[in-house]
């Protein structure tokens, strides 16, 4: 943890400022100690350089462990090798630029950016490298925050936090840009998680989310409906199930591709990872465009831009 992160975070219980207690510093990094609220005295550990600002409960523990295992397997290349959900690194950066209408990353100098649900930190690191003049904060609920921290530790403009997005340890009106792709629909209450993120944006700042649409029908979501309790399976069984389901779908896709009725983006490993992604979480919600637009307007956002590049809901709003 870098010392200047303390000025960017706050107590999730009362919003008070944090002080450092028993901090041990190694090569300009705070590697252990505690963050203690100066108002309510709540404290949270710094573990191997990672601030862990969480409260535990049984339901959230299951979700945290599930996504932690998923990202660890991806990092170990047990699914895809060089892509995430079939996308290469440059495609992730292009999506980020398009979502916010960014021309050049150099224009982000001085901006504070939140990657809300950063997973293992691949995109977080790529954004920080592309925009070295910006400050990038990655937050994830799961143990994958440790992977993100290891990946980003040498980048001077990145901070990683393990925290709950429904109770973020971040002050209102802190961020110029908030990016949250495929994350808040896996929380117990999507609208509540959105309501926790929305106030964090500065005036004229932008908030982007990507979540599942109620209108979309796909083999992945059909599998989720049929196997809705699959998240209770042991991880090895769930891993095997994802690959088992992927094989016939991949074969069918290749046949369609050979007949030139479609161009299939995903390779077999990406298909298996997508099945694992929909079967492993306890929570998975879908919403309508009208519903999501209402969330943005309720929190003072205008200029909504819905992407046409996905059948799901990808939308960016500007804080008025």
Question: What are the functions of these language-model segments?
Answer:
Residues 2-171, 284-285, 291, 303, ...:
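Conserved N-terminal segment of class I S-adenosyl-L-methionine
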Residues 179:
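A conserved beta-strand element that flanks and buttresses the S-adenosyl-L-methionine
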Residues 183:
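Hydrophobic adenine-recognition pocket in adenosine-nucleotide-binding enzymes
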Residues 191-203:
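A short glycine-rich, Lys/Arg-flanked "PGG" loop and its adjoining helix->strand segment in the class I
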Residues 206-237, 247-251:
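Conserved class I S-adenosyl-L-methionine
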Residues 217-226, 265-284:
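Short, glycine-/aromatic-enriched active-site segment of Class I SAM-dependent methyltransferases
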